[in-house]
């Protein structure tokens, strides 16, 4: 029955090749995802920060109350951790590890992104080949220096794609309200996903001035209501989510250029297909552009009227490319903005519109290129990294043995790579991976006036740092664990009179190895 409902296009050899290649890729993706899903080690340097806030919710604590800051700190939205804590409470009788469960939620978000991409392509082309290829390409959204990282990224991408999907099908005011709600929800998942409002608004201008106006008004109303409630419930949220989040970013033009080069090199079949589709679809567009601001009798007419209605995904490709020129300079992320924002909408639009190309040979060449480059090269060599070898695992286990011996000595762990070990062994979590971000905020009277909680956090952090430095300078901490990125630097600890007794090289995800150090007072060592 299910097979009968699908109106398959007549497959040629290229169609079978694309379908088979996508199926094999998905199988490989599932196998490697399972490996990274159950890994007891961090899949990314700051992964535990996402677990830490979920833990706070499970313990009934307010993660955005300055009482808990520092050492706790989290700059992303709360929707993913809150959802995870609620679901985790429902299945508490299963006794599943929280890290494993949150990774599973993130992986589910990846699958949902692939599903909605495939659904949109299938709706527009009625081709299972194009739909399956879109599903496979979209799986890249889950990559963040490794697979199955417990981050809110994939949930944010799913809500972003769902917003575009629903916006394209707006018919009533209720539909507009739903799209506005999803738009605002995306901000509270991870802040930059709210950018989805731009392509939605632009597209509505080509459709109906009234709908565009309603969308803006409903979105503003929804945000004001949500912000009022959240500011009451979580006093420090907006200070952290806006002020601190903007302060942590360091930017590099060379970092952006490297990512654009990778995108151009391995996604050139999709990019070429995009240009061909846009040219063929809009080459005969009327040169007359009618712009009307009259909200009277023609309020249901578009603000900008063209002979060919632009596609919301084509607009999204253009908008997100411009956005990436800014976000892509952020040195804290490599390719993730491109994978999350640009690639999904690029895949959806190009594969939905590929049949506009009349020459089958050209279409086949682009499809084969897409499979070989955009899917397999990126997928197998970047999205699916090699497994951790026995030597790398032994490094982790040797460090765990050292920490097991130090547990009763008052050890303090300042490496986020070992934050889960600290939590599992009832030790304080002194650095969850984002604790260091507290110190990035610069003093500003304007910021203090608009976001008073930001000033409170800065003052509390200063007192906490002074107390910590006092404890170190008087050797009150017998054992300190840091790494090469820790905010407790090696130079500071050496000046304070601490010496390294052990150093271990640890692998986390696909990033270069991190070096973890064990420090004790030099006088004790001597």
Q: Whereabouts are the PLM-identified features?
A:
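Perimembrane helix-loop-helix junctions
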Residues: 2-10, 196-222, 236, 246-250, ...
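Extracytosolic helix-loop segments that constitute the early lumenal/periplasmic catalytic or substrate-binding loops
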Residues: 49-72, 79, 86
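Loop-to-helix entry region of an early transmembrane alpha helix in multi-pass inner-membrane enzymes
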Residues: 82, 90-112
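Transmembrane-helix signature of polytopic, membrane-embedded enzymes
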Residues: 114-141, 157-158, 174, 315
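Short acidic/glycine- and proline-prone juxtamembrane loop motifs at membrane-interface regions
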Residues: 145-155, 334
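Hydrophobic/aromatic-rich transmembrane helices and adjacent perimembrane loops
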Residues: 156-159, 195-196, 330-358
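Membrane-interface alpha helices of multi-pass inner-membrane proteins
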Residues: 161, 175-191, 197-204, 220-224, ...
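Extracytoplasmic
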Residues: 377-522
């Amino acid at each position: 029955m299910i097979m009968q409902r699908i109106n398959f296009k007549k497959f040629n050899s290229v169609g079978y090749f694309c379908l088979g290649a996508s199926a094999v890729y998905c199988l490989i993706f599932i196998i490697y995802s399972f490996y990274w899903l159950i890994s007891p080690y961090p899949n990314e340097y700051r992964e535990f920060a996402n677990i830490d806030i979920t833990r706070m919710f499970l313990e009934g604590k307010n993660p955005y109350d300055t009482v808990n800051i520092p050492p706790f700190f989290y700059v992303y939205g709360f929707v993913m951790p809150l959802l995870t804590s609620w679901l985790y409470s429902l299945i508490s009788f299963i006794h599943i590890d929280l890290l494993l469960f949150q990774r599973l939620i993130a992986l589910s978000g990846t699958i949902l992104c692939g599903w909605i991409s495939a659904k949109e392509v299938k709706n527009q082309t009625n081709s299972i080949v194009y739909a399956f290829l879109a599903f496979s390409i979209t799986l890249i959204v889950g990559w963040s220096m490794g697979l199955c990282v417990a981050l809110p990224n994939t949930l944010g991408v799913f809500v972003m794609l769902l917003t575009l999907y629903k916006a394209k099908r707006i018919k009533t005011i209720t539909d507009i309200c739903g799209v506005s709600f999803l738009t605002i929800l995306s901000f509270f998942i991870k802040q930059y996903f709210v950018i989805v409002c731009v392509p939605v608004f632009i597209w509505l201008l080509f459709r109906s001035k009234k709908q565009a106006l309603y969308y803006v008004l409903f979105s503003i109303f929804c945000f004001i209501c949500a912000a009022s409630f959240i500011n009451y419930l979580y006093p420090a949220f907006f200070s952290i989510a806006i002020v601190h989040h903007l302060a942590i970013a360091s930017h590099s033009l060379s970092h952006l250029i490297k990512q654009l080069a990778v995108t151009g090199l391995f996604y050139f079949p999709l990019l070429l297909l995009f240009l061909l589709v846009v040219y063929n679809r809009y080459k005969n567009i009327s040169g007359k552009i009618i712009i009307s601001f009259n909200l009277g009798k023609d309020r249901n007419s578009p603000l900008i009227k063209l002979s060919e209605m632009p596609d919301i995904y084509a607009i999204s490709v253009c908008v997100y490319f411009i956005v990436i020129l800014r976000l892509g300079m952020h040195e804290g992320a490599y390719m993730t903005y491109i994978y999350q924002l640009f690639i999904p909408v690029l895949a959806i639009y190009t594969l939905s519109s590929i049949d506009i190309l009349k020459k089958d040979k050209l279409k086949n060449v682009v499809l084969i290129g897409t499979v070989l480059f955009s899917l397999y090269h990126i997928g197998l060599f970047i999205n699916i990294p090699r497994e951790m070898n026995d030597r790398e695992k032994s490094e982790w286990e040797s460090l765990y043995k050292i920490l097991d011996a130090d547990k009763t000595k008052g050890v303090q762990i300042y490496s986020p790579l070992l934050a889960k070990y600290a939590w599992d062994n009832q030790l304080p979590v002194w650095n969850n991976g984002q604790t260091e971000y507290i110190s990035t905020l610069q003093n500003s009277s304007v910021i203090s006036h608009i976001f008073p909680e930001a000033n409170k956090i800065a003052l509390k952090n200063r007192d906490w740092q002074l107390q910590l430095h006092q404890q170190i300078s008087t050797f009150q901490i017998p054992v300190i664990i840091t790494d090469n990125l820790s905010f407790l630097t090696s130079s500071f600890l050496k000046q304070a009179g601490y010496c390294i007794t052990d150093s271990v090289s640890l692998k986390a995800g696909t990033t270069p190895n991190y070096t973890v150090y064990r420090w004790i007072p030099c006088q004790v060592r001597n």
